[in-house]
Design a protein with these regions (language model features):
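Enzymes that bind and transform nitrogen-containing heteroaromatic metabolites
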Residues: 1-189
């Protein structure tokens, strides 16, 4: 069974991007040398441990210009969207599109991932999956930055508050990694 991981870089005040969608400052740590103790799977690097599928939204897909048809990690990308962009799908691209909603996308991701990792790569996808009880772990990369406004990571959660287990904390250069396990009672069977 796949492990579903919500994985995002965020400002200290909880924003994944500036109000205009800019992410340069939130992701500036990616260009800095990191200590050996930094978890590879948390950085979504090529060869990251067990990463098989990334589920993203249309906005992220467009901002990344479709990753040129292949995500840098080598993982398959499933884009949840209301409509398939013009010129897609492309032959040989490791990007597919789901127009039937998040539940269909997650079923497809699970079938592809097997016992590997499914990374959730956008706030709206993370929020929808948390609301459905589909998330096993939350990995946030907190950068020492206060944006004051922007796109929040957890802006539209529904239901009861989610109490997470104690985090694993890994200090990096310009980033602190916080890895939380979502308790079993919050996950769908």
């Amino acid at each position: 069974m796949a492990t579903v991981v919500a994985d995002m870089s965020v400002s200290l005040d909880g924003f994944v991007a500036e109000a205009d969608g800019g992410v340069e400052r939130v992701f500036a740590w990616y260009g800095k040398p990191q200590p050996e103790s930094q978890p590879r799977e948390g950085r979504c690097e090529p060869g990251a441990s067990g990463l098989r599928v990334i589920v993203a939204g249309r906005r992220t897909f467009e901002q990344a210009e479709g990753w040129g048809g292949k995500h840098p990690t080598g993982a398959l990308v499933i884009v949840v969207t209301h409509g398939i962009p013009e010129g897609w799908p492309r032959e040989g691209a490791a990007v597919s599109f789901v127009t039937e909603g998040i539940e269909t996308a997650m079923k497809q991701a699970a079938a592809i991932a097997g016992d590997g990792v499914i990374a959730l790569a956008t706030p709206s996808i993370i929020q929808q999956c948390l609301n459905l009880g589909l998330v096993d772990r939350i990995q946030v990369k907190v950068v020492p930055l206060l944006l004051g406004a922007g796109i929040p990571m957890f802006g539209k959660l529904t239901g009861d508050p989610i109490e997470l287990e104690n985090p694993t904390v890994v200090e990096g250069n310009g980033v602190t990694h916080l890895h939380y396990r979502v308790p079993d009672q919050r996950r769908a069977a």
